[in-house]
Amino acid sequence: YAEEGKKVFAVDVDPDANLGLALGFSEEELESITPISKMRRLIEERTGADKSNTFYKVNPKVDDIPETYGKENNGVRLLVLGTVETAGGGCVCPENVMLKRIINNLVLHRDDIVILDMEAGLEHLGRGTTEGMDQFIVVIEPGARSVQTYKNVKRLAEELGVKEVKVKSSRCIS
C-alpha cells in the first residue's frame, strides 16, 4: 500500500511486540520507540488520571499521537502501543482507554491503511478494541484448540461488524 502512495500505519498491540522487525525496522530504531502505554505523563495529560485521581476522561485527544510518536520506515509508520507489564500493578483503565481511542481514531476517522498486530486470543474483541475494522486475518496452528479459538474470534468479530474474517494456517506440513 505504501508503494501505491497510501498512508500506512502499522500498530503493534501484541505484548510480544515484534511487528517492527517483520517490517524491516532495525533493532536500534525499535529501541528508540517508547510504547504509548509507558508514557505516563502523556496518559495523565490526556486522560486526567493520576495516582490521586480515580476519575479520568474516556475520550481523550489522540489524533496527533500516530504522527508524533510513530516511527517511519519504507513508507510505513509504526506505532507501538504496549501492554500491561507487571502483575498486580493495579488498574490500567486510563492506559486501555488511550489505546482504544488511538486505534479507534486510526480506523474510523482517517482514510489510511491500518494494520494491527494483536495478541492472540479474545480479550481485544471483548474490550471492543477492534471495532470498525474491515477485515481480520486469524493465524491458526494445527489442532482443535486453535480452530476453536478461530471460530470464537470469527463470531465475536462479526458481532463487532467486521466484514471479513480470513484464516491463515501456520506450522502446517502439506
Predicted regions and their residues:
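Conserved catalytic-core segment of NTP-binding enzymes
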Residues: 3-4, 95-174
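Conserved protein kinase catalytic core
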Residues: 18-20, 86, 123-125
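Hydrophobic/aromatic beta-strand patches that form the interior of the parallel beta-sheet core
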Residues: 9-11, 77-79, 137, 166-168
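Generic anion/oxyanion-binding catalytic loop in active/binding sites
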Residues: 8, 88, 139
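Short flexible/disordered coil segments
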Residues: 46-49, 73-77, 140-144, 173-174
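N-terminal phosphate/diphosphate-binding loop that engages ATP/GTP or pyrophosphate donors
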Residues: 3-74
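Phosphate-binding/switch loop-helix module in NTP-utilizing enzymes
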Residues: 51-122
